[in-house]
């Protein structure tokens, strides 16, 4: 497995990861290549998006880091980072999330972030456990979410 920056050519493989998560009942909606491009590869607030790629070239997971701006949909404080992690259930427990976070943490430090938010569904126990294992701490619980912070 290797990690590298996400590129436009990865959108289809990234959509496949999210759709595998959906098929496993761990995501509320399926997605497509167009949505991936807009939300993860080409957004104006992107700091970094990194993919984990298997030895066969298949995308195993990806992680995005965005800069929180005023009025963002997660109500994260302006200037914070906003992280999102997506790992295929077929690649679970193989160190994919840890490898992705190492790259994301490096990018956050280089960008000068002081805090990163992970807004996780209150019913997403796997996501909450992952972020806790990475060192995030719960700092607020708006309706239906558990928001965890990582302080750099």
Question: Predicted segment positions?
Answer:
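Residues within well-ordered alpha-helical secondary structure of globular protein domains
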Residues: 17-20, 133
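Short alpha-helical
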Residues: 9-13, 59, 125-126
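C-terminal "cap" of GNAT-fold acetyltransferases
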Residues: 78-81, 117, 121-128, 132-152
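Acetyl-CoA-dependent GNAT
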Residues: 8, 21-90, 139
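Conserved GNAT acetyl-CoA-binding A-motif
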Residues: 108-120
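A short beta-loop-alpha structural element at the N-terminal edge
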Residues: 2-16, 27, 140
């Amino acid at each position: 497995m290797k990690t590298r920056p996400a590129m436009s050519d990865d959108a289809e493989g990234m959509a496949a990861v999210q759709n595998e998560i959906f098929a496993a009942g761990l995501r509320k909606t399926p997605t497509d290549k167009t949505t991936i491009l807009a939300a993860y590869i080409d957004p104006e607030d992107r700091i970094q998006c990194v993919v984990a790629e298997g030895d066969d070239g298949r995308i195993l997971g990806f992680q995005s880091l965005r800069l929180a701006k005023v009025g963002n949909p997660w109500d994260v404080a302006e200037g914070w980072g906003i992280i999102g992690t997506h790992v295929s259930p077929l690649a679970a427990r193989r160190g994919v999330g840890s490898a992705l976070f190492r790259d994301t943490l490096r990018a956050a430090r280089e960008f000068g972030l002081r805090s990163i938010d992970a807004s996780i569904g209150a019913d997403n126990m796997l996501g909450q456990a992952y972020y806790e294992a990475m060192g995030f701490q719960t700092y607020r619980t708006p309706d239906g979410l558990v928001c965890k912070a990582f302080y750099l």
